[in-house]
Amino acid sequence: VERRWTAVEGSSMYLRVGESYTLRELLEGLLLASGNDAALAIAGSLGGSEFIERMNRKAEELGLTASHFENPHGLDAEGHRASAHDLALIMAAALQNSVLAEILSMRSSCIHGVTYVNHNKLLWNCPGVNGGKTGYTKAAGRCLVTSCERGGVQLICVTLSDPNDWKDHAALYDWAFETYAEFSLPE
């Protein structure tokens, strides 16, 4: 871990300069603890200055049309933006990756003797929630992307700048699963 990766504002997994972490450990610190330092360490290790270009290329491949990335952690920056629709597409893609799906569903993880608890409290409070990512910046406010599966149906919910995100996600899932009806179209 390089010192420059640890000098970032906001949430952190408190990486130790000079210590080694696996990519899996950094992903857990990023996704459970919202570790901005982990995001910088991943970007620095996997591509340096080219990492953001790779992120934006991947965004195009995923069909994201209203998002552009300027940094790996999502903190406010000129030109950095993401729409609710695009965040849902990112979550859907992440859930297709077994490692990311597993990490997103973890309630906690112990890395180098430090326990990280997932910021997504819906994992404890909302039946069927099996993943998600919290976010907050002064410009964006509270943002939340979650996934929930009940009865073999998987849904993704995204709220942006929502001070009641936990209640809103739980209520939206309850409403959607209560009103969802499966039917066959006539041929």
Where do the language-model regions lie?
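Active-site-adjacent loops and short helices of periplasmic peptidoglycan-processing enzymes
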Residues: 1-85, 94-95
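Domain-terminus/edge residues, biased toward the C-terminal soluble/receptor-binding domains
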Residues: 64-65, 76-187
